[in-house]
Amino acid sequence: MARYTGPKVRLSRRLSTNIFENAKGTKALERRPFPPGQHGRTRRRSAGSEYLTQLQEKQKAKYIYGLLERQFRKTYEEANRLAGPTGENLLRLLELRLDNVVYRAGWASTRPQARQFVSHGLIQVNGKRLNIPSARVKKGDVVTLSPKAANMIVIQHNIDTLDHSVVGWLERAEGGKQVTVRTEPAREHIDVPVREQLIVELYSK
């Protein structure tokens, strides 16, 4: 599936969020906390910008989790069929993607890197290799690094140096090279800068 390959810093500035979780994006937002372009510093959102604000929240969620529109819409429709708040359901389904679990486990420094690890067959679920980034894990699933991945310098470096602790719905084992899905993530365990209710309002129009 095609992914966004354009200027990442520019996109992060447009959405006012470091959506690709890299140091370059963080520095750019600190240095220029306004949209790109000739009039970015002084440009105001139009008075009728409710739709634009809602659209921006959807775009942020799409780019953070690496989905294209069709896949994102399909996930939203599934979330809407579930019991409970649709917005929270949406974020929960996105969090349970295998590539996101690899990122949350601390094996990858960014979600795009996590997606690459999964696509290259470096991840196992319940003892079997799974190379589909969008595959969804469930409570009780055990996600591990393949023997090859467990010996990769880049992954060991990430485990040793990344400054984020494993989220509450995952449990680490095997020196950080295995995680078990303890439960489905609650909203308070999801730290993405997305106002999910605005996405619900957008799709409800």
Regions found by a protein language model. Name each.
Residues 113-115, 201:
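Short, hydrophobic/aromatic-rich beta-strand segments within well-structured domains
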